[in-house]
Amino acid sequence: MTTDDVWGWSFDVCGIKLYHEKGYKGQGITIINHEANSGHSAMTTNMLKRVAPAATVINARVTQTTSAEKLYSYNWKIDGKTYTFDEMYNTFKPDIISTSFIGTVCKERDDMLKGHIENGDFIMCCATGNNGAEGVQGVYRNVAINVGACFFRGCKSKIDIMPYSGRNKDNLKVDYVGFVGDGSGTSNACPFVAAQIALFMCRYGKVPQNEFKQIIKPYCIDLGDVGKDYKFGDGLIVLPDKEIIRMKFKDVSQNDWGKSSIDWIAEKGIMNGYDDGTFRPDEHLTRRELSVILNRFYELIK
């Protein structure tokens, strides 16, 4: 079986071929490839451009000086010029950052990145690592979308699993792996997923990270146990080919801890907002209203 045969199979299953045929190839989306400081640069760039050929891909060589709590320097070298993180962000305005870099604990850096992510500035994808510690701390701190690998070799029955670092399952949280992508290692699978997100944004518009995760979960293929599991997370992402309803209530802020759940139950028709565009999240339910909600949920899942 040739490499093109393998790619053809996964591109079909994951919806990539269909998106390309419909003209969604990542145009208008900027991806920072945080891999220019390793031998992964050419490999990961090729993956990004293969899945999202019209996206703008910028390679960055990143250096940082940190302690467990303090960020002393965080520089991004792009096309021979060095930028601080803020300068990089303000200059290139990335929609997606693809990386396998988050291997050391640094609260200040991680909090800064999480602030940008929660504000909807960009989505970050991080490789969980094949058999080392890379990615582990970033995964545990819940900064990025954590990507494991499953190399299909052309069909679902022949999968090489590399879903996480070499820690046994007893030391892993169930949310260690967020999703998996096709690739012969997590550093390959991560740009696969990042580029899928670029295709999604090209079709449906730019979305915050938490909202993307909630939208895409129903379209994922379980590769292991039914539901979320420690090896495959929510599974293999399949790009949707339908209208996506994105609920926006003017009294539910982007940083509201319940936003993703509120959007989901509204999209599914379990609860609705009010005619004035509000959800009124602090209002109480009556027993009658609760009965209706539970019945709608039952009808949805049965």
Predicted regions and their residues:
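Hydrolase catalytic cores
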Residues: 48, 60-63, 176-231
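Acidic-leg catalytic submotif of subtilisin-like serine proteases
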Residues: 1-3, 7-43, 126
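Structural recognition of the beta-strand scaffold that forms the well-ordered cores
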Residues: 30-35, 56-61, 95-100, 123-127, ...
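Catalytic-core regions built around general acid/base machinery
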Residues: 107-125, 142-143, 260
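Subtilisin-like peptidase catalytic core
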Residues: 35-108, 223
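Short, solvent-exposed alpha-helical surface patches in non-cytosolic proteins
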Residues: 194-197, 245-247, 256-271, 275-302
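Extracellular S/T/G-rich loop segment that most often corresponds to the catalytic His/Ser-adjacent loop
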Residues: 136-202, 206, 236-241, 263
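C-terminal subdomain of the subtilisin-like protease fold in secreted/lumenal serine endopeptidases
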Residues: 8-17, 86-89, 94-98, 144-146, ...
